[in-house]
Structures are given as C-alpha cells and as structure tokens.
C-alpha cells in the first residue's frame, strides 16, 4: 500500500485492485486483522481498465453501500485522498464514548446517527449494536491515534460484493479493550465502565437470539394446547376400528348384456296379444272356470308381464296385482338380509362419529353448560312418579 506511515487511513479514499484486475474506489471504514478483511464504504467499480485479464469487466455506475474484501486476492491498495481534518476532542485514553451534534463537519455524519454497516451480523467483529453507530464520526476524528498500516502485513483479498441499504447496516467499534471513566459531549458524566466492545455486542446478540427462540416456541405451545383441549372433552370418543363386511366387485357391470334381457318389442307384442285375448272373452261372455281362477291366483308372475295397465283391475278385485315379497315368500327377511339389500341398493353408508358436531357431544365436556332435555326419560320403568 502506498502512502506515508503517518497518514490516518480510516476515512481515506482508497483505490483497491483485486487479482481479477478489477479496480474499486471507496472510503476505508474498517480493517479486521483477525479475519484479514477490509471494508470499504461508498464503493464504485471501475472494471479492469485495459489491464490484462482473461475475463474483462466493464465499469459500473452503481455506488455500493459497502464491500468487504478478503486479503489474499487483493493485488494493490492506494490511498487517493486522506481524510479531512476534523475538530474533535484531544486524544485522551479516558474517553470511552462521545457523540457529535447535528452540526458536525464530518461528511459521513448526517443529522441522524448513521452507519453504513448496520446489517453485517454474519461478519462477527463488524457487527455491533445500534448504540455503536455513533462511533463512525468519532473514529474519523481519532484516526490519528490508530497505528499506521504497514505494507504487506495485512494481505487482503476480494471476498464478495455485498450491497445493502444504509438503514440495514451496522458499524464496527474501533475502541481499545480497556475502558475507564469518560464523559460525553452532551454534558452528562458517564459512569465508570470496564466493558469492551465485545461485552456490549454480546448481550444484544444473545437477546436477539432469545427472542427468535421464543417466537419459534410459541406455535408449538399453541399446537400442544389445542391437543390438550381436544383430549379433555369426555364426549369425544375415539372411533374404534370396526371391521365391516365390504362388498367386493369383480369386473365392471355389463350394461349391454343386461339390456339384452329386456327386449321391449317382444314384451309389447305379448302384452297386445293378451289384451286382445281378454277383449274377445269379454265380448263372447264366456265365464271363467274355477280352475282358471286358481291358475291365475297361483301364477301372479304371468300377470306381471302384462304391464302397468293390468296391475289393477276394478271389475276383478279391489286389490292390485303388484308383486310383493309377502306373496312370493312365506318367510320374513332377516335383519342381515335387509341390510345387505339396502347396501346393494343404496351403497355403503358412511360412519357416524359421535361428538364431532358439538363440543362434548350429548354428554358435554367439562364446564360447557349443556343439560339434558328430558331427564325424566331415563326413569321409565322404575315405578317412580
């Protein structure tokens, strides 16, 4: 790095060339010797600028809020402009913290305390709480007290270009580890403190992590609470696994073969023939024998083929000839046969679960205030009045 040894580099305008032959210009903000990184603020990329490289890059007009460079990939660093002189407090090691007013002459200190590194928590030493954002102007004023940067001692490499708004960035605290009693510029006397920058940063980070953990635990508590309220109600019984006889269908239903059995044309012909036969008998006045009457009573299936017009004959009898199971079979159907018939006709019915429609069902849960509508119905047959 070029420049004299007595030049305060913090706040200076730096020209940085990476090993990719890309030149950047920005304001030197922090130097992290532990991670071998350099942070520049208000950075602009000028591209490769006719330097020999396999991948030439054009210049860019965007101004990045900050860029963090890693040590081993930086080729050259040049100080373009030193920081402007600031009228600040004398370099007193007793000063722990100071705050400048809104009329500060620093070009990087607006009316509101500002720091371009407020959202850099993943970089460790560069992350700090919002109280440390006021140290930017103070660090520029105390820049002469920082040791000069020797050439070649801090290898720096371009790590990544990270863009971000100024409201989401944190500043690094550039104070010595030991602190004593100090004063602030607003006239109040500060209390003695021996906390370092890391001591101030760690409680904020631990508190933020604790808030995140609490937010993650709240949905789990709500879900567990819902489970407790569901299991406490007495009326909601768990449905038992009842094995029911399911009907197995083998293959699809053949509608063509079923319709072939019912030939309407042949049925209509037989129906007309029987109607004509009855009309002839009525005209001739022939009386039916008893054998014919008994035969017609024993064979109701033949009369059923006559169609809907012959189901009821007023002159013959008051009752109709509609087929009934009571006439065809003397045995009464059992409950299982009736259930099977209903299943074949209407399909399998769904299971009825108790206690799903209301809280606690008929019995009611704890404290739901449900009462029985007819309490005397359970006393039937006991002999009480």
Curated annotation (Swiss-Prot):
Major location category of this protein: cytoplasm
Glycyl lysine isopeptide (Lys-Gly) (interchain with G-Cter in SUMO2) crosslink residues: 248
Keyword Ubl conjugation: yes
Domain Sm: 2-83
Pfam family, one: LSM14
Modified residues (N-acetylserine): 2
Chain positions with Phosphoserine modification: 106, 115, 154, 165, 329, 349
Known function: mRNA-binding protein essential for female fertility, oocyte meiotic maturation and the assembly of MARDO (mitochondria-associated ribonucleoprotein domain), a membraneless compartment that stores maternal mRNAs in oocytes. Ensures the proper accumulation and clearance of mRNAs essential for oocyte meiotic maturation and the normal progression from Meiosis I to Meiosis II in oocytes. Promotes the translation of some oogenesis-related mRNAs. Regulates the expression and/or localization of some key P-body proteins in oocytes. Essential for the assembly of the primordial follicle in the ovary.
Protein name per the record: Protein LSM14 homolog B
Organism name: Homo sapiens (Human)
């Amino acid at each position: 790095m070029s420049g004299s040894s007595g030049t305060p580099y913090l706040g200076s305008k730096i020209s940085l060339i990476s090993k990719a032959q890309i030149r950047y210009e920005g304001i030197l903000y922090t130097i992290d010797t532990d991670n071998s990184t350099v942070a520049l603020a208000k950075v602009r990329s000028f591209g490769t600028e006719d330097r020999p490289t396999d991948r030439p890059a054009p210049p860019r007009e965007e101004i990045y809020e900050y860029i963090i460079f890693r040590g081993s990939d930086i080729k050259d660093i040049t100080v373009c402009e030193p920081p402007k002189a600031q009228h600040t407090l004398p370099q007193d090691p007793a000063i722990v913290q100071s705050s400048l007013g809104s009329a500060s002459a620093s070009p990087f200190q607006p009316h509101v305390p500002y720091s371009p590194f407020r959202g850099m928590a993943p970089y460790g030493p560069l992350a700090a709480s919002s109280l440390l954002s006021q140290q930017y102007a103070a660090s520029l004023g105390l820049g002469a007290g920082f040791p000069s940067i020797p050439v070649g001692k801090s290898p720096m490499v371009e790590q990544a270009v990270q863009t971000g708004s100024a409201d989401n960035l944190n500043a690094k605290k550039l104070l010595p580890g030991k602190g004593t009693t100090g004063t602030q510029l607003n006239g109040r006397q500060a209390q003695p403190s021996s906390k370092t920058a890391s001591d101030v940063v760690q409680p904020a980070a631990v508190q933020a992590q604790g808030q995140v953990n609490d937010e993650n635990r709240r949905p789990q508590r709500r879900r567990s609470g819902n489970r407790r309220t569901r299991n406490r109600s007495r009326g909601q019984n768990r449905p038992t696994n009842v094995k029911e006889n399911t009907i197995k269908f083998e293959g699809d239903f053949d509608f063509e073969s079923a319709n072939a059995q019912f030939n309407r044309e042949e049925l209509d012909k037989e129906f007309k023939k029987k109607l004509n036969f009855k009309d002839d008998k009525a005209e001739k006045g022939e009386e039916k024998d008893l054998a014919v009457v008994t035969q017609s009573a024993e064979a109701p299936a033949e009369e059923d083929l006559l169609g809907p017009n012959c189901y009821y004959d007023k002159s013959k009898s008051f009752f109709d000839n509609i087929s009934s199971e009571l006439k065809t079979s003397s045995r009464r159907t059992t409950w299982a046969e009736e259930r099977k018939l209903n299943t074949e006709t209407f399909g399998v019915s769904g299971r009825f679960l108790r206690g799903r429609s209301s809280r606690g069902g008929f019995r009611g849960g704890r404290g739901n205030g449900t009462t029985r509508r007819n309490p005397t119905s359970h006393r039937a047959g006991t002999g009480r009045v």
